[in-house]
Amino acid sequence: MLKRIKSVIIGAGLVLDYMYDNAHRIIMGVPRLSRSQITAHLFLGSQYNLIGLEKLKALGVTAIVNMRTTNSYNDAVHEGIKYLHLPTPDNTAPPLETLITGATFIEDEIKKGGVVYVHCRQGLGRGPTIAMAYLIKLGLTYEDAYARIRAVRKFINPQASQVKRLKELEEFYSNSE
């Protein structure tokens, strides 16, 4: 019974979160594009709901990277999907170690033939930051990684602190070669 109540409360929270997100997008003029394909094995988007999780599974997603501070889903929901939660407050840059952890997780999953979905709340700042971290790990410059993602997700908006941290990551990888 308690499990059922918890499930209903989480579900209600997700519905409210989804409604808020859509209202915010309409007011701010941000498109409602839920996900963008960055590479053959990497998708970037906003927080998904339970229906969206089924769509991700249908796309072949084998791993999820969540950049939100909240973790709305328990492990049972992600049955069969690897899950990395890297809690990062909105409009802030994740620590360098977090970018390295996320980029390595994405790279490892893709090398195994997996498909990764990266998200934050709206897919504007934190999600694109970790996706760019992966592309930088592959050898792209920050500018090239940004251009690649912006080509398919025009409304990304990394904060100045996130850009600075990504440039630090680029320097880290170029010094470790």
Which positions does each model-derived feature cover?
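Cysteine-based protein phosphatase catalytic domain of the PTP/DSP
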Residues: 27-115, 136-168
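Sequence-pattern detector for short linear motifs
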Residues: 7-9, 71, 129, 168
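Non-catalytic regulatory/accessory regions that flank a structured catalytic core
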Residues: 1-27
